Design a protein with these regions (language model features):
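Long amphipathic all-alpha helical oligomerization modules
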Residues: 350-398, 412-466
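Alpha-helical transmembrane segments and their membrane-interface boundaries
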Residues: 1-189, 205-215, 449-466
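Intracellular, membrane-proximal regulatory regions of polytopic membrane proteins
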Residues: 1-36, 42, 180-191, 202-387
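Membrane-helix cytosolic exit motif
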Residues: 207, 403-413
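Extracellular/lumenal glycan-associated surfaces
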Residues: 91-92, 306-308, 400-402
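Aromatic- and histidine-enriched alpha-helix N-cap/loop-to-helix transition segments
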Residues: 56, 298, 302, 389-392, ...
Length: 466
C-alpha cells in the first residue's frame, strides 16, 4: 500500500523533469522573439539596417589608424579618439551627423585653445600656485557651460558641443600639470577628431544618405493627408441613409489621429532642428524654410483637436434635421478634399492652386450652415440647441483648414514650389453627397422658425450663429 508521502515523490520528480526539459527551450523562444522583432524593424524601415552597416564600415576604417604602424607612430594612443568620435557623432540622418561633427570639432578647438591659455596663466602664477589656478579655471568653465546648456536654443542645437567643451577643457588643462608637451596632446586630439568626423561625413553623405529635411517634408504632408482622409472618407461613413429616410449615425473612431495629436509635435521639432544643419540637396535649396513646416504642423494639430467634440456629437443619439445633417456632411467632405489637395501639393512640391476651389466651396458650406441655423429648422428644440455648439466647432474647423491652406501657400512661395503644368492632375472629385442633400438649396429652404425661449442663454459664438 502506497502512502501519501510516497505518492508525492513521483509527482515532484515528474515536475522537476519537465522543468529541466524546458530549460533549453526558454532561451530559444526568446531568441526567436528577438529575431522576429529585428526582422520587423528592418522591414518597417530598411534604412535602419543600412545605417548599422555604415556605422560598422566607418568604425573599421578609422580603426586602421590604430592597427597600421605608420599611422600609429604619428598619432600614438590618441588615434583611439577617432574611434570614439565615430561612435558618438554618427547619427541616422545627415543633419544629425553634421550637427554633431561641427559641435564636436568647434568645441574641441575652442576648449583646447582656452585650456592652453589657462595653462600659460597658471605657469606665470608660479609653480606652487599652478594647481590652484588650473582648478579655479576648470571650476569656472564647468559652471558657466553647464548653466548655458539650459538656454532653450543652446539646448536644441549646441548641447552636445557644450558637453565636449567641458570635457576637452578639463582634460587638456589638467593634463598640462603632468605632461610637458600639452600643445602636442591638444593637437593630436584635434587631428584625430577631424579624421573621425570627416570619415563619418563621407560615409553618411555618399552611401545611401538619410535627409532629415526630406523626412520632415514627407511627415507633414502625410499628417495632412491622414486628416483629410478621416474627414472625407471616415466621416462620410457616419451619415448613412436608412430605409425610412432618417439619417443614422455610426460611431467613428479617432484612433488614427492619435499620432497627429500626441507624437507629431516632438518629431517635427526634432526633424526641423536636424534639417537646419543639412546643406542644399535635391529639391530642397540651402536655407529651406523648415520652420514653416512647424507652423503647418501646429495648424494641423489644432484642426485635429476640433474633431473631438464633433466625435462626441456623432456618438450621441441626437437626431438633427436632415438639412443640418447635409450641411455638416458637406463641410466635412469639402474640408477633407481641401486637406488632401494641400497634402498632395506639399508632397509634389507644386503650388496648391487646385485646392482653391475646394476652399471656396468650404467657405460656402460654412456660410450655408450658418444661414440654415439662422433661418430656423423644425425639430426637437433640445436637439437643435445641442447642435448649435457643434456648428460653432464646425466653423472653427473650417477656419483651421483655411489657415492650413494659407500656410501651405506661404511655404510654396518661400520654397519656390513649381507651378502645375498642363499635364498635371487638375481633376476635382465629385462631392459624394446623397442626391436629396445636394438638391437642398438655400433658395428652396422655407422660412421656418424654432420656438426657442427668449430666456435661453447662449455663448458669444452661439449668439453669432443664431
Amino acid at each position: 500500500m502506497v502512502g501519501p508521502e510516497n505518492s508525492e515523490k513521483p509527482t515532484i520528480l515528474i515536475r522537476g523533469w519537465l522543468w529541466f526539459r524546458d530549460i533549453p527551450s526558454k532561451p530559444l523562444a526568446k531568441l526567436r522573439g528577438v529575431a522576429r522583432q529585428a526582422i520587423e524593424l528592418a522591414k518597417d524601415d530598411p534604412r535602419r539596417l543600412i545605417h548599422s552597416l555604415k556605422v560598422g564600415l566607418t568604425v573599421t576604417l578609422v580603426s586602421l589608424l590604430y592597427y597600421l604602424q605608420p599611422l600609429y607612430n604619428n598619432l600614438g594612443a590618441s588615434a583611439m579618439w577617432a574611434v570614439m568620435t565615430v561612435v558618438v557623432v554618427f547619427e541616422f540622418s545627415v543633419g544629425g551627423t553634421i550637427g554633431k561633427c561641427l559641435n564636436r570639432g568647434l568645441a574641441t578647438l575652442a576648449a583646447a585653445a582656452l585650456a592652453l591659455g589657462a595653462n600659460h596663466l597658471a605657469i606665470l602664477s608660479g609653480g606652487e600656485n599652478e594647481p590652484y589656478v588650473i582648478g579655479l579655471f576648470v571650476f569656472i568653465q564647468a559652471v558657466a557651460m553647464s548653466f548655458v546648456r539650459f538656454f532653450p536654443k543652446v539646448k536644441a542645437r549646441y548641447d552636445y558641443g557644450m558637453l565636449i567643451f567641458i570635457l576637452t577643457f578639463s582634460l587638456v588643462s589638467i593634463s598640462g600639470l603632468r605632461i610637458n608637451e600639452v600643445i602636442k596632446l591638444a593637437q593630436a586630439r584635434f587631428v584625430t577628431i577631424v579624421i573621425g568626423a570627416s570619415t563619418c561625413l563621407a560615409v553618411c553623405i555618399l552611401i545611401y544618405p538619410v535627409w532629415a529635411g526630406e523626412d520632415l517634408h514627407k511627415y507633414v504632408g502625410k499628417n495632412i493627408s491622414q486628416l483629410g482622409n478621416f474627414l472625407e472618407e471616415h466621416m462620410d461613413q457616419c451619415f448613412k441613409r436608412s430605409s425610412d429616410a432618417r439619417i443614422e449615425i455610426t460611431k467613428p473612431s479617432i484612433s488614427n489621429l492619435n499620432s497627429i495629436l500626441v507624437d507629431s509635435k516632438g518629431r517635427e521639432e526634432t526633424l526641423a532642428n536636424l534639417a537646419g544643419w543639412e546643406p542644399g540637396h535635391g529639391q530642397f535649396m540651402f536655407r529651406h524654410p523648415w520652420k514653416q513646416y512647424l507652423k503647418i504642423g501646429n495648424l494641423t494639430r489644432q484642426c485635429a483637436c476640433r474633431l473631438e467634440p464633433i466625435n462626441d456629437y456623432l456618438n450621441s443619439n441626437i437626431q438633427a434635421p436632415q438639412e443640418i445633417q447635409c450641411k455638416i456632411q458637406e463641410a466635412f467632405s469639402e474640408s477633407g478634399k481641401t486637406l488632401k489637395e494641400l497634402a498632395w501639393a506639399i508632397e509634389t512640391m507644386t503650388k496648391p492652386s487646385s485646392a482653391n476651389p475646394h476652399i471656396e466651396n468650404l467657405k460656402t458650406a460654412s456660410e450655408n450652415l450658418k444661414i440654415l441655423l439662422r433661418s430656423g429648422i423644425k425639430g426637437d428644440e433640445s436637439d437643435i440647441l445641442q447642435i448649435i455648439p457643434i456648428a460653432v466647432v464646425m466653423t472653427d474647423m473650417v477656419s483651421s483648414v483655411e489657415q492650413i491652406g494659407d500656410a501651405v501657400n506661404e511655404l510654396s512661395l518661400m520654397a519656390k514650389f513649381k507651378s502645375k503644368t498642363g499635364n498635371g492632375v487638375e481633376g476635382e472629385s465629385e462631392i459624394g453627397h446623397d442626391k436629396n442633400c445636394i438638391e437642398i438649396g438655400m433658395a428652396e429652404i422655407p422660412s421656418l422658425s424654432v420656438a426657442i425661449d427668449e430666456r435661453t442663454e447662449f455663448s458669444a459664438d452661439e449668439q453669432i450663429l443664431i
